[in-house]
């Protein structure tokens, strides 16, 4: 149990957090606060998960459409967090795009199912395979039907790139609905991942069902109001714990203090972690162990039932025939250059190989880097315009 002294510290921290101006945690509220119009839409997948999308509508009807899809433990909030003139969603909106931001099952905005409450284990019985097979296609279909467009452009970060490739592997008919796909920090092959956390734990947790046995197939890194308020206060730029908060980010994606604005830390804590399943994390650990881009490994007992073989089949990258543009960093601990280039060499329509011209560019710089516009977003916009 916590002693009186510890309780006092926690209450003091929470009191300070609640007394000051709290960072906005809701994506739609943030967009309005930044001076943009916003719409909230929902779609139900064919397996009954209810997903929420955020849209920054265009000023003119018939504008070209872009879908932004987040990484693991993230949400639509990441695309607007850095504010006007810096965040990708606003940059694309200012350029005349109809901007839609998806949310995968299990995150802050998509914790809903037609039949299952989130406290049932079965709700969390999915990996990013299901996000690619069900969530992304449902999101695309809804957007195209709502806007009357036949195609859209896709931008994904991290797991948002993974699920795009899964969709194309398993549902190649969606190639016809994509003008171009821009993959930031593309996560497919991950055998050379440098993240010390992954390298330490993946050999154990990446064994079939190992992590599920240890943790339970439930939410990975669940958050609540208490944790959020505590994180916001501890991660303020003036906090003595600010460096600890920054190091948490660096340990995941690579050290790059030049691209991290400490003033952004408390805003990151207001929106992240946004929710994911244990199996999503386990699936990435399996990718590191196997050095393959393949389906979820249930074990030699269940795999024959699921796949008709003892090992899970590889995803069919040859099916990703819509133009794919790769953007990656030399200091990305999650997506190593050699892994990205293996992906590049297997894509049938690789339209751009873009190594960010900043030596220390890390995995999370794609969404939170202070110079993301200069080094990445300007190039993304230029390439997108070439497909209109």
Where in the sequence are the language-model features?
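Cleavable N-terminal signal peptides of Sec/SRP-targeted secreted and luminal proteins
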Residues: 2-19
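Alpha/beta-hydrolase active-site loop
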Residues: 121-146
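Alpha/beta-hydrolase-fold enzymes
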Residues: 145-150, 161-305
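Catalytic active-site module of serine/aspartate enzymes centered on a nucleophile-bearing elbow/loop
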Residues: 351-388
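Short, surface-exposed "cap/lid" segments of acyl-processing enzymes
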Residues: 30, 45, 52-116
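Short beta-strand/loop motif that positions the catalytic acidic residue
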Residues: 320, 325-328, 332
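Short alpha-helix in the alpha/beta-hydrolase fold that links the catalytic acid
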Residues: 322, 336-346
